[in-house]
Amino acid sequence: LTEAKAGLGAVGDYVGLEVNMRPAGGYTTDMTNFAHSTDVYEIWADMITANRRLLPDCGVHCCCAYAGRRDFHRYAHTHEEILSRYADSIVMCERLPEVMWPQMGNQMYMAKLRDQEKTDAFIRFVQERMK
């Protein structure tokens, strides 16, 4: 920045013009589907074939969180503990392809949660490291 901008930064700070804060690949559409209990592919097909959305909004909306883990870290909670504690919330759990490891970790957990507080707690639990 050449001049200070409130809420953005001070003179000399670098500011990302575009910051990609989503998982790579098809996970974004999965997360949208889970968070809104919908099917974005069907909505897209409706737009192409009928020029409008035909799939009704079921009105069920929540948060969908992605939490990744790396094999080289020691975590406070085991894979089994995560699955047990969040059994009713986890919608996807898988080992990622090696090409995604540097950006997204080796193991991913995706969960559908009621609100931001529960979402933050899920991410903290999954990613908490041993001290």
Sequence positions of predicted segments:
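Generic detection of intrinsically disordered/low-complexity segments and helix-coil linkers/edges
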Residues: 8, 35-38, 60, 95
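Conserved metal-phosphate-binding beta-hairpin within the catalytic cores
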Residues: 1-27, 66-79
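Peripheral (often C-terminal) accessory segments that flank ATP-dependent C-N-forming ligase machineries
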Residues: 45-131
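Generic secretory/membrane-interface signal
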Residues: 12-16, 33, 88, 92
